[in-house]
Amino acid sequence: MSELKMSLSPHIHGGDCIKRNTYGVIFALVPAMLMAVFSYGLNAIYLGCYSLASCLLAEWLITRYLMRRPCSLADGTAVITAFVMALCLPVRTPFWTVVLGAFGAIGLGKLVYGGVGRNSVNPAIVGVCVTLLCPGSLVLSPGMGYGVKSPYLFALAMILGLGFMLWKRIITWHIPISIIVTTIVLAGVTAVADPAYADPFNLVLGGGTLLGAVFMATDYTTSPMSRPGKIFYGIAIAAIAVMLRTHGEERNAMLIAIFAMNILTPIVDRIFKPRRYGKA
């Protein structure tokens, strides 16, 4: 009789589970992408198409010719990376910058670790970091998914996406809700202390808070496994982001916060270990 082996979650039993979740996230991103098109017109379509084509091409070229293994395009993760990265970028980002960011996201953010489920940092964040290093980068311009033009409509699009993923049990509430609530509380405290700081609700509606909380911080591979760990992770992301914003880093505060906590996720998992089955 073979030995029974037990390990921590997540337990993925087949490719269908991964595809179901990734395609569910893609569907949840559709309202945000449509809102970007509504707000920015053809420029949003161009940016989305550049990002999508570049990410798909990067995945195909790297897996086929560098890694010498079957292409993994069917899992849908490259599409998620493309859409999230497009929402993080300014709408007038040059084509060549988007291409470099896409190759950085797929190559350095995912495939260099071995592929899906092995990366330690959200690939879309890696892609945005690559674009920020490019000459002439629009560092001070907000991403088209930051809700600058239509904050309430963008917030509605993000909430629709969040509601769908919660309904389908693609994600749990622990990370997004802890980020949103902590941001409101901490930003409210700073606004009371100094009225010059942004209103907490405006901070949540704009500045990429909802985009990061719903579609970036909730990435399975780069977030903690236990429920207490997820809540701590969300609180820490919000605290770092609010602190950075109070010191003048408006646009990239959420990206930096998620990036930092992605790196610290293994430590969070060690601190908040799930109780063993049968143990008090």
Where are these regions (language model features)?
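C-terminal ends of transmembrane helices
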Residues: 9, 57-69, 106-117, 160-170, ...
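Long hydrophobic alpha-helical segments that form multi-pass transmembrane helix bundles
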Residues: 117-160
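Loop-to-transmembrane alpha-helix initiation sites
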Residues: 120-125, 200-209, 230-232, 248-259
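Conserved mixed alpha/beta catalytic, RNA-binding, or beta-rich assembly cores of soluble enzyme
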Residues: 165-196
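Structural signature of hydrophobic alpha-helical transmembrane segments
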Residues: 41-54, 92-101, 146-156, 197-209
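Hydrophobic, membrane-inserted alpha-helices
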Residues: 28-35, 59, 78-86, 102-109, ...
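Cytosolic-side transmembrane-helix boundaries in multi-pass membrane proteins
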Residues: 1-23, 224, 244-280
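N-terminal signal-anchor module of multipass membrane proteins
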Residues: 1-56, 60, 277-278
